[in-house]
Amino acid sequence: MIADNILDRNFQADRPNQKWLADFTYVWTAEGWLYVAVVLDLFSRRAVGWSMKAERDASLVMDALMMAVWRRGKADALLHHSDQGSQYTSEQFQRLLADNGITCSMSRAGNVWDNSAMESFFSSLKTERTARKVYRTRDAARADVFDYVERFYNPQRRHSKLGYLSPVAFEARAMQT
């Protein structure tokens, strides 16, 4: 099922778990491609869910979404925005969204600007970590991507849109006010 573009390039969120962006990218290894799916909370730009596999089927993006739901819990009025890839339009993925009360939004066909904040995350991942590396195995790439997301990007990487705070620090500050 292809959903309407409800997000409509409104990349602002007033609270955590209001708008999640999702997409996946590829990392080359000597064993072949490693596919990396990520769910990003638009409020803080925090990677709240991710999955890495040798295949790019619906389970790749479903696992990333399930991690996000497990970490953040079910939220009221949550919007999930992705592209129109077959993984996101699959019956299994759409059922998972519905079962968790999540509204589906999708970019217009072939329009990367409709999910530009997600594209920016992957640009950072590749520029800052994976582009200059040669991974011998998928496991080596998995370990490095995990390190980037969980030990650097979420807790340390500063964002101009967040007042030069990291996603974790931005959320912590927001919880205090």
Where in this protein do the model-derived segments appear?
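Charged DNA-binding/catalytic regions of mobile-element recombinases
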Residues: M1-T177
